[in-house]
């Protein structure tokens, strides 16, 4: 089932689209289950869910965009748990509006340790 939400309940501009299963939980096996929009109509955020749990086996389960369309953030989840993207354990990457990496978050599930690397807009590590 697809539900659309508009500002002030009127069709002034689309603010969110939800895809729900028969139990009313966010669910879409073929794309994002929740999409939010800027007033301009451009996509602000896409969230992937299966049976109410943030989940995407083929990429990030959370994608945020700047209004200019550039990626703001990728975050990886499987079954509502943070899931490392690769053997380096990257779970979240955030970008500046110009497209350069701002922040990388790594998580080791075995040791429960996190590592955060922050960059300035020139690409130099600051933390």
Q: Whereabouts are the PLM-identified features?
A:
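Glycine/tyrosine- and acidic-biased, solvent-exposed loop/turn segments at the edges of beta-strands
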Residues: 1-127
């Amino acid at each position: 089932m697809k539900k659309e939400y508009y500002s002030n309940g009127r069709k002034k501009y689309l603010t969110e689209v939800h895809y729900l299963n028969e139990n009313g939980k966010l669910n879409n096996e073929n794309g994002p289950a929740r999409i939010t929009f800027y007033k301009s109509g451009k996509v602000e955020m896409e969230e992937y869910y299966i049976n109410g749990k943030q989940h995407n086996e083929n990429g990030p389960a959370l994608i945020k965009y700047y209004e200019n369309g550039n990626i703001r953030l990728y975050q990886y989840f499987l079954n509502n748990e943070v899931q490392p993207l690769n053997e380096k354990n990257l779970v979240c990457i955030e970008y500046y509006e110009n497209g350069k990496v701002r922040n990388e978050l790594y998580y080791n599930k075995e040791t429960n340790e996190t590592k955060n690397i922050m960059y300035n807009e020139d690409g130099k590590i600051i933390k």
